[in-house]
């Protein structure tokens, strides 16, 4: 869509990254970390035009002198002032648009508290004067992006994971399962097991280094026990990583032990079922007649599904749980890191969607609760 004048904005607010851009585009124009940084020591950088807060990549690059905070935890906004800073940064610095001129589509985690989406609605209309807005469920958008309207989405980002069965475009709320285990927990776990190897990572700045190690070197083993034996008996699985200061560290079985926690949350001291079981449990909560369609359309989405080997392992684990004759298909689109955003871009540019927007006028008449009537 070349006509940015009236194009809707699509903002996928993740716990870890904000993905933002224009409806009709095939990828987000701005992707930056959902972080707000504040100087650790007031006045250290006298005369450097020091600001009281930094957002996104700028906070990331100055992380050595800042305390970094994520305003979203587990997919839910915990600090609205910081969240507002992130939205302000998105509109004015990243997309360079006037928010009062564009309808905006926001995304939210399934099973989000009602107050959360009301507050989002209120901020968009009252702080940013949006002409119209809509709040869509992330997993549903991922399914649209894969070209389906029925299937089960396993969506795992930085802060929260969900299994969301969707039938003919509607999420089935009674069968949605939520798992507070996602990318950030895996990063923390990798920090912990690297410490056991004698490397110390403790600060918020060092956590970002470990996140990079995770994204570049970790993978999911098809058979965990087998892989552990291979790692113990040879150095074939070892990889080296150069830290920003030039020190080189070696990482071995940590490469697959880290994401294994998705399948065995006990590694993190959590009592919940692994992602394969959660998926299966979610399917079993659905009507028996639609299960076949869900098994055959299991869609992975979100950054924490980007580990190499995760789709094959998921296939293997779900096959072991499902009835023996069931056809199981795991769909892992290569662009799944952004599939929520892509689905939003598709939805907001459909002509049939245009009547779905909540307008400023409707908001003024009904208040924030309008969001529950119009977005479901």
Swiss-Prot record:
Positions of the pro-segment in this chain: 1-2
Catalytic activity: ATP + H2O = ADP + phosphate + H(+)
Subcellular compartments: Cytoplasm; Cytoplasm, Cytoskeleton
Matches recorded under Pfam families: Actin (PF00022)
Keywords: Acetylation, ATP-binding, Cytoplasm, Cytoskeleton, Hydrolase, Nucleotide-binding
Any GO molecular function: hydrolase activity
Primary localization: cytoplasm
Modified residues (N-acetylaspartate): 3
Entry's EC annotation: 3.6.4.-
Broadest EC class assigned to this enzyme: hydrolase
InterPro entries, per the entry: Actin, Actin/actin-like_CS, Actin_CS, ATPase_NBD
A single Gene Ontology CC term: cytoskeleton
Role this protein plays: Actins are highly conserved proteins that are involved in various types of cell motility and are ubiquitously expressed in all eukaryotic cells.
UniProt record similarity statement: Belongs to the actin family.
Name the UniProt record assigns to this protein: Actin, cytoskeletal 1A
